[in-house]
From Swiss-Prot:
Stated role: Part of the ABC transporter complex HmuTUV involved in hemin import. Responsible for energy coupling to the transport system.
Record's subcellular location: Cell inner membrane
The EC number(s) this enzyme carries: 7.6.2.-
InterPro entries: AAA+_ATPase, ABC_transporter-like_ATP-bd, P-loop_NTPase
CDD domains linked: ABC_Iron-Siderophores_B12_Hemin (cd03214)
Main location group: membrane
Name used for this protein in its record: Hemin import ATP-binding protein HmuV
Assembly information from the UniProt record: The complex is composed of two ATP-binding proteins (HmuV), two transmembrane proteins (HmuU) and a solute-binding protein (HmuT).
Pfam families: ABC_tran
Any one of the GO CC terms: plasma membrane
């Protein structure tokens, strides 16, 4: 289990994140929302250990994250950053197979997992193609498959951190991606996903953290958090919130 206590992160001598207390729960998708500059990517950086905590601590299975070896950490924690740079002409399946490097499961099992992750991210049809020949959205889905393969099939004790995994995707693949993430959590993994689309968060997330100015504004179920008052306070946006006629989750409509 991944949790943070009173997390503060500094950049350039100023706090970009302050007062964060958070626990990722097995089987849960936690969505992180907020305007640009709210601290969403800084939160992911602090949780993953990429950014050092100026104050507070990050704990993985009740042990400070910094005390884990790289390989042991990678077997429990996978991170998909906002931008994943790769300048080599690897085939798609080779990129996804990079997620298996921390493991010692053997070639046959690794190939099975890579194929399963390719299918989950809807990129199996791209196998054999050069990564460099792909569109931005295709590359994003290949990297999703890579981090899924790293923790496949997802189970309690696994933690997946995703920074805007739908940003380059068309509407269909936004849902395909979040359905894959939802299925991963349903098998027991804890997932944190940064999103900008309020309605995607309402549909796929169990809890939502609303950030404002690097601090937590609201944390709770989508029904509790995605209300007109908090959304006006954080985004400056006037909205109507209705119940989805078929699924029952909040449906947010800009006025």
């Amino acid at each position: 289990m991944l949790r943070v206590e009173n997390l503060h992160v500094r950049r350039g001598g100023k706090d970009v994140l302050a007062g964060i207390d958070l626990q990722l729960l097995p089987g849960e998708v936690l969505g992180v929302l907020g305007p640009n500059g709210a601290g969403k990517s800084s939160l992911l950086g602090g949780l993953s250990g990429e950014l050092a905590a100026h104050q507070g601590q990050v704990l993985l299975d009740d042990q400070e994250l910094a005390h884990w070896s790289g390989a042991e950490r990678a077997q429990r924690l996978a991170v998909l950053p906002q931008a994943s740079s790769l300048d080599f002409a690897f085939r798609v399946e080779e990129v996804v197979a990079l997620g298996r490097l921390p493991h010692q499961t053997g070639r046959v099992r690794d190939e099975e997992i890579v194929n399963a992750a390719l299918n989950a991210a809807d990129v199996a049809h791209l196998s054999g193609r050069s990564y460099l020949a792909l569109s931005g959205g295709e590359r994003q889905r290949v990297h999703l498959a890579r981090v899924l393969a790293q923790l496949w099939p997802g189970q309690p004790g696994h933690n997946l951190l995703l920074d805007e995994p739908t940003s380059a995707l068309d509407p269909l693949h936004q849902h395909v991606t979040l359905q894959a993430i939802r299925a991963f959590a349903d098998r027991g993994a804890a997932v944190l996903v940064i999103l900008h689309d309020l309605n995607l968060a309402a549909r796929y997330c169990d809890r939502v953290l609303l950030l404002e100015g690097g601090r937590p504004h609201s944390l709770g179920t989508p029904t509790a958090v995605l209300r007109p008052e908090p959304l006006k306070a954080v985004f400056g946006l006037e909205v109507l919130v209705q119940e989805h006629p078929e699924r029952g989750h909040p449906l947010i409509i800009a006025r």
